[in-house]
Amino acid sequence: MSGGTPYIGSKISLISKAEIRYEGILYTIDTENSTVALAKVRSFGTEDRPTDRPIPPRDEVFEYIIFRGSDIKDLTVCEPPKPQCSLPQDPAIVQSSLGSSSASSFQSVSSYGPFGRMPTYSQFSTSPLVGQQFGAVAGSSLTSFGAETTSSTSLPPSSVVGSTFTQEARTLKTQLSQGRSSSPLDSLRKSPTIEQAVQTASAPHPPSSAAVGRRSPVLSRPLPSSSQKTAESPEQRKGELHKIQRPDTEQKNDYKNDLSRRQPVLSAAQPRRGRGGNRGGRGRFGVRRDGPMKFEKDFDFESANAQFNKEDIDREFHNKLKLKDDKPEKPLNGEDKTDSGVDTQNSEGHAEEEDVLAAGVCYYDKTKSFFDSISCDDNRDRRQTWAEERRMNAETFGLPLRSNRGRGGYRGRGGGMGFRGGRGRGGERRGAPGGVGGFGPSRGYRGGSRGGRGGREFAEYEYRKDNKVAA
């Protein structure tokens, strides 16, 4: 970094660590984020400096570029700021302009600004937000854009000179290198030092407004031109600053409130589960499209009982069982039921039961056995078919409900435990909930609702070989 004392508004020659040289007007220095802002910047490329990636010069004039201080290799003051003429301190003057020539040559403070029609330094200094974004160098070396005056007119030359650096250029580079780098400014750089190039338009035709960056939202809105003769009142400025400084949470709340106003208002008669439209529609399924169900009168149980026909229900019940019985059954554990003679045994067993009932034999004789012959069907050495198992389950627990219901009907508890049989009559006792105890051999259907299903589902996986239940 070569000698000279830099001033705000002076022409600066800056060389980055990528060996690219830039020239522009010193706009401000942020020691908190260790950044340097230049206005009216032009890139001269790498020129003759040795580098791995030579870059040619560019003809465009950037309105505003922010450089990271740690990536600046050299900084030279080419020209000090030119003397600026000002109008006398007349309270009658609200705002003045000298035309385009003065704006380009920085002769008038009132029309001066690196962004063309941007407000003057005195207008910037009245905003506390700018003072927060672009802080001063330690001590009184750099003030924020200019001294604050009672009238928003021009600044005398002494005010601008007083707002310059009082340290040497080498000290300035040391402060920039020691400052922390700003992580949100890593994007949009063709060399490591370019932080933001907001405007790429040419200098003679600057836009009416320019965005300074993410940290300065006050400059992103349209700003008044120098031809305007009306001054903003302090109340209006306070209101605008209040809107700018509001946190993001308040803006999100305003957005949610606006959405909630657009939602149709639910009546008080609708269920409360319809709330939550702004939270992803939680509970919207609880709201009926045609409104809540309304009943004109109480339910008439007598008329409903009169319409109840038990014969029709029994007929439907038997039809459902018949349809299920007619379905072909899969072989269990590789055995073919057609060859086992189970059907003939079942038919013979039913015939024997009818003969016993017709003869009027005593159903319970404790001299012969402790068990009776009514509730026990284990007096015949046969295997129970799936059709009989379904029929017994239906008679005991009722018809099954929908297939996707986990508990309810006869598909309630017991789920899939049929393969856990052992000894006893568990699967063949009517209405036996647990199915444990007993003496005779059994396939081990543990009653319950899904005992038979469990054995059928796990028939292909040889579950009994690996997980045997101890006797």
From Swiss-Prot:
Disulphide bonds in the chain: none
Name of this protein: Protein LSM14 homolog A-B
Provenance organism: Xenopus laevis (African clawed frog)
Gene3D superfamilies attached to this UniProt entry: 2.30.30.100
Comp. bias intervals (Low complexity): 208-227
Single GO term (MF): RNA binding
Motif (FFD box): 362-378
Bias-annotated ranges (Polar residues): 172-185
Extent of motif TFG box: 381-401
Assembly: Component of a ribonucleoprotein (RNP) complex, at least composed of lsm14a/rap55a, ybx2/frgy2, ddx6/Xp54 and eif4enif1/4E-T. Also forms a complex with prmt1 independently of ybx2/frgy2. Interacts with ddx6/Xp54 but does not appear to directly bind ybx2/frgy2. Different translationally-repressed mRNP complexes probably exist that contain either lsm14a/rap55a or lsm14b/rap55b depending on the developmental stage.
Modification after translation (UniProt): Phosphorylated.
Domain notes for this protein: The RGG repeats are required for interaction with ddx6/Xp54 and accumulation in ribonucleoprotein complexes.
Localization of this protein: Cytoplasm; Cytoplasm, P-body; Cytoplasm, Stress granule
Regions that span the bilayer: none
Pfam families the record matches: FDF, LSM14
Membership in a protein family: Belongs to the LSM14 family.
Function: RNA-binding component of messenger ribonucleoprotein complexes (mRNPs), storage particles that mask maternal mRNAs from the translational apparatus during oocyte maturation. Acts as a repressor of mRNA translation. Probably involved in the storage of translationally inactive mRNAs in the cytoplasm in order to prevent their degradation.
Compositional bias per record (Basic and acidic residues), positions renumbered to this chain: 232-261, 320-340
Biased composition (Basic residues): 272-286
Domain called Sm: residue spans: 1-81
GO cellular component terms, A-Z: cytoplasm; cytoplasmic stress granule; P-body; ribonucleoprotein complex
Keywords: Cytoplasm, Developmental protein, Phosphoprotein, Repressor, Ribonucleoprotein, Translation regulation
Residue segments, region Disordered: 172-292, 320-353, 399-460
Start and end residues of each DFDF domain: 287-323
